[in-house]
Amino acid sequence: MAIHADTHDDLRLFQTGEHACGYWSDRRARDLVLDPHDPRLGAIYPQALAWGFRRSGDLVYRPHCERCRACVPVRIAVDAFHPDRSQRRCLTRNQDLVVRVVAAERTDEQLALYRQYLKYRHPGGGMDEHGATEFDQFLIGGWSHGRFLEIREPAIAHLPGRLLAVAVTDVTEHALSAIYTFYAPEAAARSLGTFAILQQIQWAQRERRAHVYLGYWIEGHAKMNYKRRFSALEAYDGRHWCDLPAHPSGT
């Protein structure tokens, strides 16, 4: 893939060549990527989040498409967040589950759940063939500030309950960033994706972190509508973070 260098103060940015858009099949995309070889990348990362960037593996990127600005960085201001009725029902429905934060170190149980989820959500697309190497490269990386938020069924006879979901979460001094969540397909009725974000918000509140970053929201994209359901949502316009009113029709 062709790469063209640019600079921002003393921080190098790279612009990728065009590639297939991961959200719209009829569009082409390109990204800005922070220099992956910069030894300061881990230290720069918290500020990069505030600039609208996101992590995937060891890469910190932001969409920078020539003819499209649909991807909008969004985050939740956790002190101002209040769950709506649907989110309160989600919390009640899942109050039997056990939630804990663990180190970002792959286990066989997590890998098995990840592969099960990919076969369910991305059949035949290549991702469903991911193994341990791809898991580590995509979710953990070499320098990230990651933790895994595990969601389990209740323990039985002092044994851990079945693993239902994992929310890969980056931790910085002032924020959490929701990287990727995967869950047991047969538990989809529990709305575990929404439940995981609610748990990340509570986690941030407990530790007095200001924001939970949710990546990108795309208006009119069905898979992104759920993000508009969260109150205290802020959007980045390229210069400033601005309030984005919750949209009750989002799912």
UniProtKB/Swiss-Prot annotation:
Annotated GO biological process: ubiquitin-dependent protein catabolic process via the N-end rule pathway
GO molecular function: arginyl-tRNA--protein transferase activity; leucyl-tRNA--protein transferase activity
Superkingdom, taxonomy of origin: Bacteria
Catalytic class of the enzyme: transferase
Record InterPro entries: Acyl_CoA_acyltransferase, Asp_Glu_LeuTrfase, N-end_Aminoacyl_Trfase, N-end_Aminoacyl_Trfase_C, N-end_Aminoacyl_Trfase_N
GO cellular component, one term: cytoplasm
Keywords assigned: Acyltransferase, Cytoplasm, Transferase
Location(s) in or outside the cell: Cytoplasm
Major localization listed first in the record, in broad terms: cytoplasm
UniProt catalytic activity: N-terminal L-glutamyl-[protein] + L-leucyl-tRNA(Leu) = N-terminal L-leucyl-L-glutamyl-[protein] + tRNA(Leu) + H(+); N-terminal L-aspartyl-[protein] + L-leucyl-tRNA(Leu) = N-terminal L-leucyl-L-aspartyl-[protein] + tRNA(Leu) + H(+)
EC assignment: 2.3.2.29
Pfam families per the UniProt record, alphabetical: ATE_C (PF04377), ATE_N (PF04376)
Family named by the database record: Belongs to the R-transferase family. Bpt subfamily.
Function field: Functions in the N-end rule pathway of protein degradation where it conjugates Leu from its aminoacyl-tRNA to the N-termini of proteins containing an N-terminal aspartate or glutamate.
Protein's name in the database: Aspartate/glutamate leucyltransferase
Source organism per UniProt: Xanthomonas oryzae pv. oryzae (strain KACC10331 / KXO85)
